[in-house]
């Protein structure tokens, strides 16, 4: 264990040393590194898929549920998507060096801010191997060194991805030490990593509630956490039924194992008799289990093919990460807002309505990182928000909120232009 701890410290030291030349690397050089990464992924597809297959087989042998297994799978289509996102990050404007908030003082001093990298970012994450590429690419683009620590369930995939990323960075003339990967999945090493505040500037955990809580409780370093998603869709009394069905279906079914998938459907009592059978019929085709309150049960009890069970108090405020939806009929928008305020996690909330006043109340009163009107909750995503990709979706209010892109992993320094002024 002592040797492993020393290796962690050495990786952090190397990342800190590499962060300095990376901080002032040219945009062209950083973009070249990202394009190299994307091409390396495509050129080494068979090896990546083979490594991922090992992860899949080990996950199946350990009894991982199919819904969770989906999170770690890389197939050819997903690999091409990861490469595409990396090319997209390369095409984004470089935030580093941006000058803003410039003002001329009465004494003639010109004072403003210049955007700079944070330095070294440690990313601790679970399940999805695409996160290895997304986070490394975003950190490099923003001039930050990165220390990657993925979960044991994707160790084979993450190992080859990190190796290819380092090769691509070095080919672009940047220090490969700017990307560090921790192969050892012992959690005790994470605890040690979280104490290296002299070498690491920010920790970003991505994963379940247990991981995020552990990092927050044990870190000596500032943490921006990608929080859990207890996500609601509220169907208002005068919603367009076809839109509401499509949004509720997409929010739940399109990819149920991710944090922006809907967990609870709130339905106004006036539209429930028409809307609920319609959405239940669509959900039944996808195998969605409905955990319904008493009012919803009465409406849906004769719906053919519907997986219907009574909701329990524990179902409200639960992140299912599966084809399960809690359904509640509410008397008013006020009741829906109160329910979300009590049970929501501050991630994403959506209203389906044709009433402008209702939409504005929802936007104003719901406290969440992303609040939507007539749109699927699945859009809360870095690529969908035009960020290229994301480091995570923060449910905090400091230092970043919502999908974290390039600007969220930079800081600024004050710059002052004078012409000989002295303070009297």
From Swiss-Prot:
SUPFAM superfamilies membership: ALDH-like (SSF53720)
GO molecular function, one term: NADP binding
Presence of keyword NADP: yes
This protein's record includes keyword NADP: yes
Pfam families: Aldedh (PF00171)
GO cellular component, one term: cytoplasm
EC number annotated for this UniProt entry: 1.2.1.41
Compartment(s) where it occurs, according to its Swiss-Prot or TrEMBL record: Cytoplasm
PROSITE patterns: PROA
Pathway note: Amino-acid biosynthesis; L-proline biosynthesis; L-glutamate 5-semialdehyde from L-glutamate: step 2/2
Coiled coil (UniProt feature): none
Catalytic activity, as annotated: L-glutamate 5-semialdehyde + phosphate + NADP(+) = L-glutamyl 5-phosphate + NADPH + H(+)
Keywords: Amino-acid biosynthesis, Cytoplasm, NADP, Oxidoreductase, Proline biosynthesis
Any single biological process term in GO: L-proline biosynthetic process
Function text: Catalyzes the NADPH-dependent reduction of L-glutamate 5-phosphate into L-glutamate 5-semialdehyde and phosphate. The product spontaneously undergoes cyclization to form 1-pyrroline-5-carboxylate.
Family: Belongs to the gamma-glutamyl phosphate reductase family.
Name of this protein: Gamma-glutamyl phosphate reductase
Gene: proA
């Amino acid at each position: 264990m002592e040797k492993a701890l020393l290796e962690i410290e050495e990786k952090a030291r190397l990342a800190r040393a590499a962060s300095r030349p990376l901080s002032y690397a040219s945009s062209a050089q950083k973009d070249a590194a990202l394009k190299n990464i994307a091409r390396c992924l495509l050129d080494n597809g068979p090896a990546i898929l083979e490594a991922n297959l090992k992860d899949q087989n080990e996950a199946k042998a350990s009894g991982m549920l199919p819904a969770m297994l989906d999170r770690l799978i890389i197939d050819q289509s997903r690999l091409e998507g990861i490469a595409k996102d990396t090319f997209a990050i390369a095409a984004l404007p470089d935030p580093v060096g941006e000058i803003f908030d410039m003002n001329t003082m009465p004494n003639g001093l010109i004072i403003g801010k210049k955007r700079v990298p944070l330095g070294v970012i440690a990313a601790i994450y679970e399940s999805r191997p695409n996160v290895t590429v997304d986070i490394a690419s975003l950190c490099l683009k923003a001039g930050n060194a990165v220390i990657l620590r993925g979960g044991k369930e994707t160790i084979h995939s993450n190992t080859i991805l990190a190796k290819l990323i380092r090769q691509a960075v070095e080919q672009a003339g940047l220090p490969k030490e700017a990307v560090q990967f921790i192969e050892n999945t012992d959690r005790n090493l994470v605890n040690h990593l979280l104490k290296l505040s002299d070498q690491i500037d920010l920790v970003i955990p991505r994963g379940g509630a247990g991981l995020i809580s552990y990092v927050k409780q044990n870190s000596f370093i500032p943490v921006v956490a990608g929080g859990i998603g207890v996500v609601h869709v509220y169907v208002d009394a005068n919603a367009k039924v076809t839109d509401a069905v499509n949004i509720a279906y997409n929010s739940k079914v399109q990819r149920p194992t991710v944090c922006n998938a809907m967990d609870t459907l709130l339905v106004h009592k006036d539209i429930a008799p028409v809307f609920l059978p319609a959405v239940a019929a669509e959900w039944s085709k996808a195998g969605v289990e409905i955990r319904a309150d008493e009012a919803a049960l009465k409406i849906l009890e004769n719906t053919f093919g519907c997986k219907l069970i009574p909701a329990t108090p524990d179902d409200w405020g639960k992140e299912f990460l599966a084809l399960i939806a809690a359904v509640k009929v509410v008397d008013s928008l006020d009741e829906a807002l109160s329910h979300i305020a009590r049970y929501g996690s501050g991630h994403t909330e959506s209203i389906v309505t044709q009433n402008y006043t209702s939409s504005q109340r929802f936007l104003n009163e719901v406290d969440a990182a992303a609040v939507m009107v007539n749109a699927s909750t699945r859009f809360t995503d870095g690529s969908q928000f035009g960020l290229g990709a994301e480091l995570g979706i923060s449910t905090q209010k400091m230092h970043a909120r919502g999908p974290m892109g390039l600007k969220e992993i930079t800081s600024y320094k004050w710059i002052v232009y004078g012409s000989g002024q002295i303070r009297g």
